[in-house]
Structure formats: C-alpha cells, structure tokens
Amino acid sequence: MAQAVASYRERQGAGETDAFPGSEVPEGRAWASVIALSRSGTTTEMVDAVRALPEGLPVLGLIGEPGSPLGQVVSSELDLSFADEQSVVQTRFATTVLSLLLGIYGWDVEASASRAEGFLTESLPDWAGEIKQFVFLGRGVGAALANEAALKFRELLATWSEGYPTMEYRHGPISAIGEHSLVWILDSEEPSIDEQIRATGARLIRGEGDPLAELVRIHRFAEGLVDLRGINPDQPPHITRSVVLAGDR
C-alpha cells in the first residue's frame, strides 16, 4: 500500500516520498511528516518504528482499531474501523487505505470503484485450477500493487506467487514460467511483453488500465480459487492477524 501511494504522490509532483515496512524504517531521514498504516495498530515493528522517530515529527496513523498501541504513539489518528475485517488476510482495509490516499493526490477513486464493482460477478476461467504459479506485473502504482497481489495469493492460497515491475520481468524471471503459470499484468502499459509471455505457454491476463480496480478483480479471483481448493480464507496457516513480539504483550 505504501509503495503505491509513494509512487503516485511523486508522479503527481507532490514531493519526494518514501515507503518502508515498520521493521525497515531508516534513521536520519529529514521527513516533513509520516503516515503509519496499520489495520490492528498492534504490530510491534510499526509501534517501535513510530516511537523511534524524532520528537515533534508529525505522524498520522491510519488505523483499523481505535485505542490501539499505535494510536497512543502517533500525533493524530484517523479511525478506519469501518474498514476493519475479521479475516487474517487484509483486503477491505488495503483497498480503503489505497482509495483514501491515492484520492488525495488526484486518483479517480469513483471510476475505480465502478470498474471494481463490475469485476465482482466474474467467474473463474475453466483453466484456473491448473495454475500452480502466479506472477503479477505492473508499472508505477501497478508495480507496487503487483507486490500486494502476490502477497495476497501467498497468504490465501499458500502458493507460489511473485510480483515484479513489468519492464524488469524480461531480465530473468520470465525463464521460470510455463504452461502451469498465470501472468497477470495490472495495467495497460508495455503490451510488447504479451507475446513473450504467451510463447512460454503461460496464461496471460491483461488489466484494463486501472491497477486499483484490478486489485479487487484479483481478490475476486483468489476468492474463487480458495472455494475451488476448499481453503478457509479467513484463517490461513502459520500467520496471525497481528505480529506482537513477546516483550510487548
């Protein structure tokens, strides 16, 4: 989510923007402000990262659970509890945060929502059950959301999924796909890669130019696959809703 917003904010000329997971926030950056994204507001790495920021630096928390530990260490908090969800895997919270922040910088969120709604009735293609490897590609915002899509497939399906910038894919990773692979391009840029992908025997889905709407389409596809495979999408193995280290309980 943060990668997508940072990319779009810079492309819109709103200023240099960084994106880091809580565990990788560097020291010494001269930021004017920070936005901390957390559905639960309890993950140790995020809370610790905010605590370590310079005193007086404005920090806005976008949090799905009010009254959380993160809410106690940020300067101000935007309550997104309406977008919270019981599932371990984030879908609604993610698309809500993306819509909010991308919309601030000019993204046509209403158009994306309309396109996304049209995807909700799509059925799985007949060949979906044959796919063993999922690859997501995009540029700019699409590249960031390709990583988000790949993460969702790993979490929901415990399957091999990857995300790459479209132009980088030909530099090596394309060699690992074949007839049991699906390559999903989230935007409409770089059509020249399509034939190279098809030549490997892989299936190809090409987005319609709106990576935010396409992310919802990908969620719908994943929902169909978990039904097909008999998986509980709300409780995937080995992961929890929040990662709280023992010393912070």
Outline where the language-model segments fall:
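Catalytic-loop motifs flanking and including active-site residues across diverse enzymes
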Residues: 1, 5, 96-100, 145, ...
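Anionic-ligand anchoring segments at beta-strand to alpha-helix junctions in alpha/beta enzyme folds, i.e.
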Residues: 1-32, 132-178, 223
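Glycine-rich phosphate-binding loops that contact phosphosugars or nucleotide phosphates
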Residues: 1-120, 139, 182-207
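Internal, active-site/partner-interface "lid" segment
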Residues: 65-66, 72, 102-132, 231-249
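Short capping/connector residues at structural and topological boundaries
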Residues: 169, 174, 179-182, 236-238, ...
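Short amphipathic alpha-helix initiation/capping segments at coil-to-helix junctions
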Residues: 176, 186, 190, 210-214
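Phosphate-moiety recognition in structured ligand-binding domains
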Residues: 196-249
